[in-house]
Amino acid sequence: MFTLSDFDFNLPPELIAQTALPDRTASRLLEVDGSVAPARLVDRHFAELPSCIAPGDLLVFNDTKVLKARFFGQKASGGKIEVLIERVTGTHTALAQIRASKSPGAGTTLRLADAFDVTVGERVEPFFTLHFPAPCLDLIEQHGRLPLPPYIEHDADATDETRYQTVYASNPGAVAAPTAGLHFDQPLLDKLDAMGVERATLTLHVGAGTFQPVRVENIAEHKMHSEWYDLPQSLVDKIAATRARGGNVIAVGTTSMRALEAAARSADEAGRPLAATQAETDIFITPGYRFRVVDRLVTNFHLPKSTLLMLVSAFAGVETIRAAYRHAIEERYRFFSYGDAMLLTRRDTPEAPGA
């Protein structure tokens, strides 16, 4: 049984990428094949991705768009607050985290961005319901700030507003970017199209829980955050066609992976084939999990002791990921959201009995 300590590693702080590279495809790409032993590691650049995949393969992208979900404001008493929108729940309502010296009660009015007032509604642990005076997506876009991850040490600027979004983002609702997709630009997508690689999209709105640390040594006790996803019938059809022609299903990012595997696991449990799905998922993928859909994964380098490091370890193999991360640190790859990428091939068999 793996414990939290099994997913720890020492990362020199200077390897945490603080800014995006000028060219999206200039990032490095570590190709990792966990289906062979010892694992095969190849140093590349992301622009070489087309040479790593085949015509007839299917790339699955998450088209969520990051909201300008961060606000500073004050209570009627003058006390300062910080608000992070977690999820838009209706035209005029959202769930949010609120940092304040004292938690506001229901009925409290909060002034945000010195521009408009919201009213606090019921508590939905650990969030607060906020009622907006106008469509909240409009107010968020007009007055909010882009919420960069906690390990990025500068406030979001105009460059971040472009580079912390994928070029294909179209469905507003995330509070963090699906960062594997940040490496794709339109010329690369056009090149993949021209060589006969299929593309499809799903939506999973990434929540702030993606940065939530695991606080228990026994990882089986960890409570995973929940996120909403939409897997359309067009994607289901493309997966079936890819399987029929012997192609690989390649998830672009762990969010695409989690949506695909959540839908497939639910279908398995119901005794039916994969189908279009709109649902919440709190799927927690750890070593021993049996992957049902995804053959390969494009992903960034993840934080020590994180659920995402556990996910990639389940996919490619614990020792394979350890070797890959050691190599990446030795070769000075850039880590986390603005960092470099990996292309992982699935380990053939799970490492231990699992879901």
Swiss-Prot record:
The EC class name is transferase
Compartments where located: Cytoplasm
One GO MF term attached to the UniProt entry: S-adenosylmethionine:tRNA ribosyltransferase-isomerase activity
Name this polypeptide is given: S-adenosylmethionine:tRNA ribosyltransferase-isomerase
Catalyses which reaction? 7-aminomethyl-7-carbaguanosine(34) in tRNA + S-adenosyl-L-methionine = epoxyqueuosine(34) in tRNA + adenine + L-methionine + 2 H(+)
Instruction: Name the gene behind this protein.
Output: queA
- GO BP terms in the entry: queuosine biosynthetic process; tRNA wobble guanine modification
What InterPro entries does the annotation carry?
QueA, QueA_dom1, QueA_dom2, QueA_sf
Sequence similarity: Belongs to the QueA family.
One CC-aspect GO term: cytoplasm
Q: Does the keyword Phosphoprotein apply?
A: no
Q: List the disulfide bonds.
A: none
Q: Which UniProt keywords apply?
A: Cytoplasm, Queuosine biosynthesis, S-adenosyl-L-methionine, Transferase
Question: Known EC number(s)?
Answer: 2.4.99.17
Pfam families per UniProt: Queuosine_synth
The record's subunit annotation is: Monomer.
Originating species: Burkholderia cenocepacia (strain HI2424)
Q: In which pathway does it act?
A: tRNA modification; tRNA-queuosine biosynthesis
Q: Is S-adenosyl-L-methionine tagged as a keyword?
A: yes
The function of this protein is: Transfers and isomerizes the ribose moiety from AdoMet to the 7-aminomethyl group of 7-deazaguanine (preQ1-tRNA) to give epoxyqueuosine (oQ-tRNA).
